[in-house]
């Protein structure tokens, strides 16, 4: 099995992976859904602060890989017969390393400028999004505190998502074609960066 991880800051366009997954009939697992589920389970409203604090608490309680552990468990229990699984929402190098200790992982970073992301989040209007710039900045800083910058910097592929949704999809489609055309090469892709201790 090959995992294709999607990383990027909030509003960068990670969810566009769902369209590509649909096109290629690939299963997709959202790490953010795991955190939102855990937030609700703890009886908290889905606000940016509550979801962010739940992510922090999960990592404090179960280690920096906590969300990756839950996702991989789900994958192994429900998708073990799949050749490729997309994991959307990788937030840290700890999570990258955890996945790569267990499965080959190709990492795709989706990047957009802060202003572009802020405008998208205002339009998206998900419960844990905010139309307040200060709350947006706090969320960015919290994400960077998880070491998401390390994951983005060490991605195998980068999509710059400043144009249209279709442009983002075309870039993702080209990357997926590269991976599918060289599947055996990427199934050996599991080098680990162990310096974050």
Curated annotation (Swiss-Prot):
Residues in coiled coil: none
Q: Extract the InterPro entries matched here.
A: NTP_hydrolase-rel, P-loop_NTPase
Q: Which organism is it from?
A: Methanocaldococcus jannaschii (strain ATCC 43067 / DSM 2661 / JAL-1 / JCM 10045 / NBRC 100440) (Methanococcus jannaschii)
> Which keywords are on file for this protein?
ATP-binding, Nucleotide-binding
Q: Which SUPFAM superfamilies match?
A: P-loop containing nucleoside triphosphate hydrolases
- What name does the UniProt record give this protein? UPF0200 protein MJ1399
At the top level, the lineage of the source is Archaea
Task: Kindly list the positions annotated as binding ATP.
Answer: 8-15
Q: Into which family does the record put it?
A: Belongs to the UPF0200 family.
Q: Name one GO molecular function term.
A: ATP binding
Pfam families (alphabetical) = AAA_17
